[in-house]
Structures are given as C-alpha cells and as structure tokens.
Swiss-Prot record:
<protein>
    <recommendedName>
        <fullName>Coiled-coil domain-containing protein 117</fullName>
    </recommendedName>
</protein>
<feature type="modified residue" description="Phosphoserine">
    <location>
        <position position="53"/>
    </location>
</feature>
<keyword id="KW-0597">Phosphoprotein</keyword>
<feature type="compositionally biased region" description="Polar residues">
    <location>
        <begin position="262"/>
        <end position="272"/>
    </location>
</feature>
<dbReference type="GO" id="GO:0045739">
    <property type="term" value="P:positive regulation of DNA repair"/>
</dbReference>
<keyword id="KW-0963">Cytoplasm</keyword>
<keyword id="KW-0175">Coiled coil</keyword>
<feature type="compositionally biased region" description="Polar residues">
    <location>
        <begin position="224"/>
        <end position="235"/>
    </location>
</feature>
<keyword id="KW-0206">Cytoskeleton</keyword>
<feature type="modified residue" description="Omega-N-methylarginine">
    <location>
        <position position="48"/>
    </location>
</feature>
<dbReference type="GO" id="GO:0008284">
    <property type="term" value="P:positive regulation of cell population proliferation"/>
</dbReference>
<dbReference type="GO" id="GO:0005737">
    <property type="term" value="C:cytoplasm"/>
</dbReference>
<feature type="region of interest" description="Disordered">
    <location>
        <begin position="217"/>
        <end position="279"/>
    </location>
</feature>
<keyword id="KW-0539">Nucleus</keyword>
<dbReference type="GO" id="GO:0072686">
    <property type="term" value="C:mitotic spindle"/>
</dbReference>
<comment type="function">
    <text>Facilitates DNA repair, cell cycle progression, and cell proliferation through its interaction with CIAO2B.</text>
</comment>
<dbReference type="GO" id="GO:0005634">
    <property type="term" value="C:nucleus"/>
</dbReference>
Amino acid sequence: MAALGRPFSGLPLSGGSDFLQPPQPAFPGRAFPPGADGAELAPRPGPRAVPSSPAGSAARGRVSVHCKKKHKREEEEDDDCPVRKKRITEAELCAGPNDWILCAHQDVEGHGVNPSVSGLSIPGILDVICEEMDQTTGEPQCEVARRKLQEIEDRIIDEDEEVEADRNVNHLPSLVLSDTMKTGLKREFDEVFTKKMIESMSRPSMELVLWKPLPELLSDKPKPSSNTKNYTGESQAKHVAAGTAFPQRTELFSEPRPTGMSLYNSLETATSTEEEMEL
C-alpha cells in the first residue's frame, strides 16, 4: 500500500495536458505521409515485439517449434502413405527424358568431350557419345577376350600333360611270349625278331611283324596222318553199300511197269555218274 503513494518514474507527475495529448504526426499538418492510406499504416492490434527484446526471441522460438512439428507431421504422413501413392509421387517428381538429355549435354560440355557437339541436335549428341564410348571400350574388350582364350589354351595343355603323366604302363597292350620264343631271343636269332621290334613293344603302336617259326614247330613236309586214311576207307564202303541197295529197289519198282524201263535206265546212269564224281 505504501507503494501506491510513491510517484511512478515512467509517468510525469505534472497535471498538464501533455500526458493526455495524442502523439504528434510525423509530417506537420498531415496525419500520414502523402499517398498513404490510413488503414494501411495504422498500427496492428496486439503486442509488438522489438527484435532486440525478449518477446521477439520468444516469437521466433514459437515459429521454429511450429515448423518442426509441421515437418514431423509430414514425415509421419509419408510413412503411413501406401506404396502406390509413393510410387505415383515419385513418378511425378522424376524428371522427363528431355531433362536427362539436357543434363547429359551439360555434363559433356563440362567435361570437354568434344567441343563440336554443342552445335548438334540432341539425337546427334547421343550418337557422338555412343561412338566415343564404343571407341574407348572396344580395345579393352578385345584384350579381355584374347586373355580368356589364352587361359583356356593353357588349361587344356596342362590337362593333357597331366593325363600323359598319370598314364600307367599297365594299361598299355602287352605281348605274351612263349618259352621257346624267349629262348630264341636269348640266343639272338635275328631271323625271329629284331631289336627295333622288341623296343616297339613297349609303346602302344600298330606295326606289322613278320615272324618265321622255328623248324621244330613247323616242318617243310607235312606228315601223313592215319585219320585221313580211315576216313577215306569208310566213305568208299558207304558209297558201295548205297549203290547195291539202290538198284535192288529200282528192280522191285520196275517189275509191274515194264513200259518205264527207259526212265529208270536214265536214273541209273545219273546215279552212277554221281557216284563217280563223289569217288
């Protein structure tokens, strides 16, 4: 209560009319500058914050908090958005082919690929770029292909060498010699085998070998065997018995038919000629 009796330093205590007078206009004789409307220049209602005052910093803080909340809400909406809507928005945001071509053209000009490209049209630019890329990438591709072919050839050669090294002698064809042949070779009969033929047996090859058998194995004159004599005697006895039986049968058939004697006579001559040929 004591403070109410104290004078306030911010207000004048004099009871003059200066305290109750409205503020003086900026231009004497006019309320507002020329060409300005009073409604536009009228002060807005509400507290006005000075930039250097604490109220201004608080207002800026509220604006930043509001922006953060807005961005956070937009991110949540993007997360809840269905996939189809996202794809549509991405397709809308994607640049068209002309934009891509322009970007490529700018990159080409920036890197200085070919200064004469700038005067060409867009299809001509693309053709020139493709030709330059083919020229730069053609040589490495040839080198890569040549290197691969060389690797394949080296691998095939290595495999062949391994097969030759792993090949065992037991798998090769062998020649079995008899005891007489071995003894003949020990006596160094050049007529039977030569040294070259013996060496060729260790290798898988096809060669013509001429061999002369020993005299004790094959004689010049063949010996007559008794089996052949017995066989010839038995065959002659069989033919004689068949010849005696066959005429008796012909006689039995010829008795009731005397008119057919000429036919049977021809048959007898035929059988006799056959017997002579067999003998």
